[in-house]
C-alpha cells in the first residue's frame, strides 16, 4: 500500500481531511513520504536549531504548485508519530513562497481532540502561536541559503478552496483514482 496514492483525501472533504503525518511536533528531522514507494525517508536534518511547532504532513491524493503533495500542519497538544493518519478540520491557510515557488500549507486541528472542538477558523488560534509558526517557516531554511517569503494567513474557507484545487491538480497529474 502506498498511503499517498491509496488513501482518500479525507472522509468529508473539504470539511474533514486526512493528514498523513511525516514529521511530528518537536522534531528537527525532516521526513518525506516517497511518492513512488510510500515509504518514509529522511530528507534532511534541519540546519537551524529549530523544531517543528506542529505535526506536519500531507493530504493524500493532492498535488500542489511546488511539485509535491499539499502540505498540512496539525496543531497537536502531544506529538504523534510519522505515518499517523489524523482526521483533521482545516481552520486556516498559511501562505509562503519557498525559493520562488508558491508553497501554501493548510492549518488544521484534530477532529478527535475535544480541546479543539470550538476551533473552526484562523481567528480561534492565538496570534502568538500563529506568529511562532510563521517565524519557524521564515527562518528554518536560512542556514541552507534558501529564501522564504511569508505572505500571511487566511481563514478556513481559503484553506478548503485550496484543498479542492489540490485534489484536482492530483487528478490532472496522476489521473483519476477509482
Swiss-Prot record:
GO terms for molecular function: inorganic diphosphate phosphatase activity; magnesium ion binding. Keywords: Cytoplasm, Hydrolase, Magnesium, Metal-binding. Mg(2+) 2 binds at residue 71. CDD domains: pyrophosphatase. It catalyses: diphosphate + H2O = 2 phosphate + H(+). HAMAP family: Inorganic_PPase. This is Inorganic pyrophosphatase. It comes from Pyrococcus horikoshii (strain ATCC 700860 / DSM 12428 / JCM 9974 / NBRC 100139 / OT-3).
Amino acid at each position: 500500500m502506498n498511503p499517498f496514492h491509496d488513501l482518500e483525501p479525507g472522509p468529508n472533504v473539504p470539511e474533514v481531511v486526512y493528514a498523513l503525518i511525516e514529521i511530528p511536533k518537536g522534531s528537527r528531522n525532516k521526513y518525506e513520504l516517497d511518492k513512488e514507494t510510500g515509504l518514509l525517508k529522511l530528507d534532511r536534518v534541519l540546519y537551524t536549531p529549530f523544531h517543528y511547532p506542529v505535526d506536519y504532513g500531507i493530504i493524500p491524493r493532492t498535488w500542489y504548485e511546488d511539485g509535491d503533495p499539499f502540505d498540512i500542519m496539525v496543531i497537536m497538544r502531544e506529538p504523534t508519530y510519522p505515518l499517523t493518519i489524523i482526521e483533521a478540520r482545516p481552520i486556516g491557510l498559511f501562505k509562503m513562497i519557498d525559493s520562488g515557488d508558491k508553497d501554501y500549507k493548510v492549518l488544521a486541528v484534530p477532529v478527535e481532540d475535544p480541546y479543539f472542538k470550538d476551533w473552526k477558523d484562523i481567528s480561534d488560534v492565538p496570534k502568538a502561536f500563529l506568529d511562532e509558526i510563521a517565524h519557524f517557516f521564515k527562518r528554518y531554511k536560512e542556514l541552507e541559503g534558501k529564501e522564504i517569503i511569508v505572505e500571511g494567513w487566511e481563514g478556513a474557507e481559503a484553506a478548503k478552496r485550496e484543498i479542492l484545487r489540490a485534489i484536482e491538480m492530483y487528478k490532472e497529474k496522476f489521473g483519476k483514482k477509482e
